[in-house]
Design a protein with these regions (language model features):
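A conserved helix-loop-beta module that forms one wall/lid of the active-site cleft
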Residues: 96-131
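ATP-binding N-terminal substructure of ATP-dependent carboxylate-amine bond-forming enzymes
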Residues: 1-106
Length: 131
């Protein structure tokens, strides 16, 4: 990784504080941190600390191609999901872009955990108590 770290955030709230923390940590490490956020609405608070990119809905057929283009054009090093729907997207992106750090589980686990009934069945099969 060079002297610059580019982070792509996918959806969600409360990202401004985290973006500021990432930038501060980058400064301490002697690296510039640039924040990008993939949005369907351009006027979001993250715009005060990063660049808002025109995004697609999670269910759009071409979302992987569009994010792949962002990864290449913006030289993205890290992708972080901030909403449940983005976790499954990120698990697929992790398979498609192994050079990008994407801290999510594999698609099967992400998919199971997104569905509460399916998640409960997985927990029960491993003898976890479910409240």
């Amino acid at each position: 990784m060079s002297g610059k770290i580019n982070i792509l955030m996918l959806g969600g709230a409360k990202r401004v504080s985290l973006a500021k923390i990432f930038k501060s940590a980058g400064e301490r490490m002697g690296k510039g941190v640039e924040i990008f956020s993939y949005e369907i609405i351009p006027s979001v608070p993250i715009a005060c600390v990063g660049t808002v990119l025109d995004g697609s809905r999670w269910g759009d057929a071409d979302i992987y191609d569009k994010i792949a283009k962002v990864i290449k054009e913006k030289e993205i090093n890290i992708i972080l999901p901030f909403v449940d729907g983005a976790i499954e997207i990120c698990s697929k992106l992790k398979e498609l872009h192994p050079d990008v750090f994407i801290p999510v589980s594999d698609f099967a686990v992400a998919h199971s955990m997104f569905d509460k009934v399916e998640a409960a069945a997985v927990f029960e099969s491993h003898h976890f108590e479910i409240p």
